[in-house]
């Protein structure tokens, strides 16, 4: 009897997952996330140098982050730009160096272009959530400015805190000798989950449940980590881009990776937004079924 109940529960669970995946598939087709990911990839490449320039300027304004700029750059390029990270880092640093020598008008233009990227992300995610109420211009600008100014500071502070914790004498003990390498190895995954969770909780102009956002963040972070490894393997083992483009191979490689990254981000957002819709549908379906039985 107990085994029959367990089998029935497992069957209901898998049936529920299947229904959710069907609902998610319809959502993905309707929202055309491949087209949105292409748009965001284009805007990202256009805004990449201005965003990095503004970020580094914000970090240089705080003396405590002066010594960790190199660590932040290395961490980002190694963990978020597979295979072509070193080459991209050289070019972007050169572009940022040129951009930082500009006038006040030029720097203001960089900030505007960086805000364009954040605005595009905001609009794309709110479209996924079917948000009807738009933020006012003042509120939207305040949020974008907060992301540009506080975002780099929070990233720098988290890396400083991590470096401090890892350097504590407590972790020099043999008991914790294996903990530090394991923690450092999992750090990119933890940062990815935290970033996706924050994105899915804060950007939509409506209330998002923590567990729904956490599910989307976990799926997106896992796909992001797997995507990094798979993409790096493809680029290194099947160097077709280098054979075709030669010295310019970094450009299409970067564009393809940015496009895939946005596909993953939007997929996580779709999962988060689809959860309450699916649960409401299941709840109403159960009520209708119960009413027909009575």
From Swiss-Prot:
Keyword annotations for this protein? Cell inner membrane, Cell membrane, Membrane, Transmembrane, Transmembrane helix
Quote the cellular component terms of the Gene Ontology held in the record: plasma membrane
Tell me where it resides: Cell inner membrane
For this UniProt entry, which segments traverse the membrane? 45-65, 102-122, 137-157, 179-199, 213-233, 247-267
Provide the primary localization: membrane
Q: Which membrane topology describes this protein?
A: Multi-pass membrane protein
A single Pfam family it belongs to is Virul_fac_BrkB
InterPro entries tied to this protein: UPF0761_bac, Virul_fac_BrkB
Keyword Transmembrane helix tagged:
yes
Q: Which PANTHER family match?
A: INNER MEMBRANE PROTEIN YHJD, UPF0761 MEMBRANE PROTEIN YIHY
Q: Which NCBIfam families match?
A: PRK01637.1, yihY_not_rbn
Q: Which family does it belong to?
A: Belongs to the UPF0761 family.
Quote the HAMAP family the UniProt record gives. UPF0761
Protein name as it appears in the record: UPF0761 membrane protein Sputw3181_0272
User: Source species, please?
Assistant: Shewanella sp. (strain W3-18-1)
